[in-house]
Amino acid sequence: MIKQRTIAQVVKAIGIGLHKGEKVTITLRPASANTGIVFRRVDLDPVVDFETTPEAVGDTQLCTCLINKDGVRLSTTEHLIAAVAAMGIDNLIVELDSSEVPIMDGSALPFIYLLQKGGIEEQNAAKRFIRIKEKVRIEEGDKWAELEPYDGFHIDFEIAFDHPAINESRQRIGLDITTKSFIEEISRARTFGFMKDIEYMHANNLALGGSMDSAVVLDEFKVLNPNGLRYSDEFVKHKILDCVGDMFMTGHNILGKVTAFKSGHDLNNKLLRKLMATESAWEWATFETPVTMPAPGLELAPA
């Protein structure tokens, strides 16, 4: 049986919040089977929990922001969720002493390291996947995204930015997403932004933690980071990283293929909501014996 997973021990890290620019402590705790991924703001009294559901995503303007029924917010969850999805973890408590997850270096790699430090522990319950049965598609202008049946988990993503530095890199990638491929090919890809936008946001007390330490920064012509890019196609790879996290907002790994053109957090979330609302388009899947199709959670992630 392919079993559910949590981490084996409590782990902590400290980073800077993207929006407030303040120190944030993140604590990951093991959770019992069938708990799901729960975010908890411990800076509030009483503490406030956020479930990982497509409907919990209430704002995607600058990041993925979870908003509960009382309007309490938790921002910048996307890179951590992508790491959790890639490691095939089903049950986890994420405690934060702030209104945002620390941005770290702008990628998912620090969270991969943190989860690996915690270790992976299998639980005595069957892991439940969401298996796509029929195509679901959503469009907005020239942007679109779709999910369709696939024997594993695959993302085919294309971006289109009219910028010299981005034009020099590959703007479309198709990749089977496994724990190994995510760590090696995707996890180090950082979020990216333009210097003029960062300066504007800083002037308006936004993205105060944003810098070249936590993003790829571009001017009108080039990448400004002294060490350049981590991958030659880092821009589209970060969009895939975001998509991995966005597709895990059910708290379950998907067996299917995502194809997207110029999509982002908002459209990805709308696609996931449409999928879950279309009962004929998906089903729950469990596996009594190990399988070898390419997807996170089908093989035990290296601790």
Swiss-Prot record:
Q: Which Cys-Cys disulphide bridges does the record give? A: none
Cofactor names: Zn(2+)
The cross-references to Pfam families, in alphabetical order and at most eight, read: LpxC (PF03331)
Q: One biological-process term from Gene Ontology?
A: lipid A biosynthetic process
Respond yes or no to whether keyword Hydrolase is given for this record. Answer: yes
Catalyzed reaction equations: a UDP-3-O-[(3R)-3-hydroxyacyl]-N-acetyl-alpha-D-glucosamine + H2O = a UDP-3-O-[(3R)-3-hydroxyacyl]-alpha-D-glucosamine + acetate
Q: Name one GO cellular component term.
A: membrane
Q: What is its EC number?
A: 3.5.1.108
Tell me one GO molecular function of this protein.
UDP-3-O-acyl-N-acetylglucosamine deacetylase activity
Name of the featured protein: UDP-3-O-acyl-N-acetylglucosamine deacetylase
State the organism named in the record.
Pseudoalteromonas translucida (strain TAC 125)
Give the gene that encodes this protein: lpxC
